[in-house]
Curated annotation (Swiss-Prot):
Secretion signal span: none
Database matches in Gene3D superfamilies: 3.10.450.10
Superkingdom of this protein's organism: Eukaryota
Subcellular location: Cytoplasm
Pfam family, one: Cystatin
Annotated positions for site Reactive site: 10
The protein's name: Stefin-3
PANTHER family documented for this protein: CYSTATIN FAMILY MEMBER, STEFIN-3
Amino acid sequence: MSQENLKIKGGLSEARPATPEIQMIADKVRPLLEEQTNEKYEKFEAVEYKSQVVAGQNLFIKIDVGNGCFLHMKVFRGLSGEDDLKLKGYQTNKTKTDELTSM
């Protein structure tokens, strides 16, 4: 097994631009996030993400919520796919340049 493979398993991927699929996942958990933060976001645009392979997949998504404000959220996607999504955490008061990290 190469060092490259050892480094990737369980670790976070490099940051990648958000895709339509990542936006769809963010939109699906948005109501839970808004309930937990007691906020209604007019803008909710996924801009980048990192992934982590576990027994499923953790997605760390940076969201532009407008006015120069960003938030980071952690979404678990189970092995059964798009219908098995769980909001596992979030961080508010982030900036565009804040790096996505494990939470």
